[in-house]
From Swiss-Prot:
It catalyses: urea + 2 H2O + H(+) = hydrogencarbonate + 2 NH4(+). The gene is ureB. Belongs to the urease beta subunit family. Pfam families: Urease_beta. Pathway: Nitrogen metabolism; urea degradation; CO(2) and NH(3) from urea (urease route): step 1/1. GO terms for cellular component: urease complex. It comes from Cupriavidus pinatubonensis (strain JMP 134 / LMG 1197) (Cupriavidus necator (strain JMP 134)). This is Urease subunit beta. Keywords: Cytoplasm, Hydrolase. GO terms for molecular function: urease activity. The keyword Cytoplasm applies.
Amino acid sequence: MIPGELMAADGEIELNAGRHTASVTVANTGDRPIQVGSHFHFYETNAALSFDREATRGFRLNIAAGTAVRFEPGQTRTVELVALDGDRIVYGFNGKIMGAL
């Protein structure tokens, strides 16, 4: 083994297998691109993103860790979200929750 070497299992690895997911249609109503990272609490994203916020409370993008989705000005797209796991306590981001979900 080499330090830092990854030894992945053979075949495909499904991200977030068995976790609760939801799809939401999002429109960027602003005049600047908005990028949302993989672990950002989607409910607390930039106010220029228009979507059903209450439906996204406790969810993040269902994408690989360390990646992001970019919403161009005027763009509308549907994204898949996955429920936050663990203790489901949210601090930071835009300060809209600051505690248990």
